[in-house]
Amino acid sequence: MSAAEGPLVVGVDTSTQSTKALVVDAATGQVVARGQAPHTVSSGAGRESDPRQWWDALSEALRQCGDAAREAAAVSIGGQQHGLVTLDERGEPVRPAMLWNDVRSAPQARRLIEELGGPKAWAERTGSVPGASFTVTKWAWLAEHEPEALRATKAVRLPHDYLTERLTGEGTTDRGDASGTGWWASATESYDSEILAHVGLDPALLPRVVRPGEVAGTVRDGHDLPFSKGTLVAPGTGDNAAAALGLGLRPGTPVMSLGTSGTVYAVSKRRPADPTGTVAGFADAHGDWLPLACTLNCTLAVDRVAALLNLDREAVEPVSGVTLLPYLDGERTPNLPNASGLLHGLRHDTTGGQLLQAAYDGAVQALLGALDLVLDADADRSAPLLLIGGGAQGTAWQQTVRRLSGRPVQVPEAKELVALGAAAQAAGLLTGEDPGAVARRWNTTAGPVLEAVERDDETLARIAGVLSDAAPLLERGTSEK
């Protein structure tokens, strides 16, 4: 390891499928060590993970970082949002965590919206209309289907909260991740007592919301990680807010993240409140807002189509009239939790490469449909779209986004932006800087800019038409999921 110019910090990304750790030089942003370990996620009706494997994965990822992790002066955890972690009086999981892409709580989401004033009231109150991904709907599902688990629950956490608490011994969260629960009111920046009472959740079970820039705690004794006792622990945040920190985002710059889920978002000074539910009015991690639209089906769904066709994910061919809506896990944008994948326009001469390109088109169209709603009215519509996430490095993803957006696309060379954003937050504790300023000093958005091409309005219109015509079928879903 080359000598660092400044103190070392650790940024962590505990995502759906793995936990990644970066050891970063706070002065330069240079990644001096990295590690990664996988998680397992249940299949079948729901999507669940045992939270204890996140801790084990964190331990393994840090072990891979070697001596550099032992020298860290501060650490921060970024994590998948919305997951419901229920803990007993000993801090052990009562049951596996229900993850963000577990859509079994769709009926509870619809009922909660109706019972508490409708979509407009929810948007004005919490910033978002809760879909099946939101934590409050999962708690309501648990109350209906597993009441014994609720009775055993003595603490409720989000995935990043769980790891932070195991480090510090204190139950904390941040405004960014809390804003995805459905029980944190963006209008007051506090937990909503009426919503909590309605779903039977004692606020004493919830973590303290740590302010941006505040120290969440220090690393305690009795853990098996390489950190020294007293190492500073930052608040952490949800994955999208962490990536926004990692990019050093300023208001108005659009981002499209291509991962297991797909997201489009931008930082805004205005508190969002979209009554249609397309845009979630999340808080960001340093005092502004992060209007965001999310799809459940992105890289994983397209890779599944490629695997079914026995094709490399880059083996696409120009589409001619075929439409594939890759809603393999139900869908959030558009709000079709019971949907499955749908293929239209198949002909004798349709090729596998065309089907694969149609899957890319279907995934990207869903994201672009929400982009204008995410951006403020005065945002520059010709500004480059920042393309991040695992899919951003793929040529087929890049070209599909260019063709369907008609915008220039910039692909930052910095990798692991969630972990990098967490590292910037940890560095801010040491230097007193805003984490976004830290990331800008690290020049994290540097990367090639792909010029704009003419937008493919014909494909966008065709996909929108199929989606409209098939809506009743997609809403009904299949008997087996």
List each model region and its residues.
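A structural motif corresponding to the C-terminal end of an alpha-helix
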Residues: 198-205
